[in-house]
Amino acid sequence: MAGSPNEDSEGSRITYVKGDLFACPQTDSLVHCISEDCRMGAGIAVLFKKKFGGVQELLNQQKKSGEVAVLKRDGRYIYYLITKKRASHKPTYENLRKSLEAMKSHCLKNGVTDLSMPRIGCGLDRLQWENVSAIIEEVFEATDIRITVYTL
C-alpha cells in the first residue's frame, strides 16, 4: 500500500504539507470557509479575496450556510464553504459537513480530483481539527478525490 509517512491511518484521504497553500499545484482546486455576507476581512480569507477577487460574483450566488459558493479562476475552481451567517458568528460542525457535501457534489459533477485547503474552520473559527478532519474523511471516503492540507 502506498502512503506517505505523515498519514495517521491507512487509506487516509488527507495528505499534510508544511508550506504555502497558494504554492499548491495549479491543477488543485482550493477550499476555505466564509460567511454568507462574504466579508472575508480576517485570517486566510483576506488572502483569498486579494488573490481571486469576485466578492460580488460570490454574493450574486446567494448561498446560505451549509452550501458552497464557487469561482472559476485560471482553469480551476475556488470553493468557498459557507459555514455561518455573518463574519462575526462561529460555524457549526453540521454546517461545515453540509457545505463539504455540497462541494463534493460539485467536484464529482465537474471532474475535480485534487483539493488543497488550510485546516478549514480551525483558525479564527475555532473548530477542532480532529473533528474537522474526521468529517472530511467521512464526506470524501467513497470518492477518488485527493485532499492536501497545508499548514505553515
UniProtKB/Swiss-Prot annotation:
One of its GO terms (molecular function) is purine nucleoside binding. The active site is at 84 (nucleophile), 125 (proton acceptor). One of its GO terms (biological process) is DNA damage response. Its EC number is 3.5.1.-, 3.2.2.-. One of its GO terms (cellular component) is nucleoplasm. Residues 2-152 form the Macro domain. The keyword Glycosyltransferase does not apply. SUPFAM superfamilies: Macro domain-like. Subject to competitive inhibition by the product ADP-ribose. Its main location: nucleus. Keywords: Acetylation, Chromosome, Hydrolase, Nucleus, Phosphoprotein. The modification Phosphoserine is found at residue 4. The modification N-acetylalanine is found at residue 2. It is found in: Nucleus, Nucleoplasm; Nucleus, Nucleolus; Chromosome. It catalyses: 2''-O-acetyl-ADP-D-ribose + H2O = ADP-D-ribose + acetate + H(+); 5-O-(ADP-D-ribosyl)-L-glutamyl-[protein] + H2O = L-glutamyl-[protein] + ADP-D-ribose + H(+); alpha-NAD(+) + H2O = ADP-D-ribose + nicotinamide + H(+). PROSITE patterns: MACRO. Substrate binds at residues 21, 119-125, 152. ADP-ribose glycohydrolase that hydrolyzes ADP-ribose and acts on different substrates, such as proteins ADP-ribosylated on glutamate and O-acetyl-ADP-D-ribose. Specifically acts as a glutamate mono-ADP-ribosylhydrolase by mediating the removal of mono-ADP-ribose attached to glutamate residues on proteins. Does not act on poly-ADP-ribosylated proteins: the poly-ADP-ribose chain of poly-ADP-ribosylated glutamate residues must by hydrolyzed into mono-ADP-ribosylated glutamate by PARG to become a substrate for OARD1. This is ADP-ribose glycohydrolase OARD1.
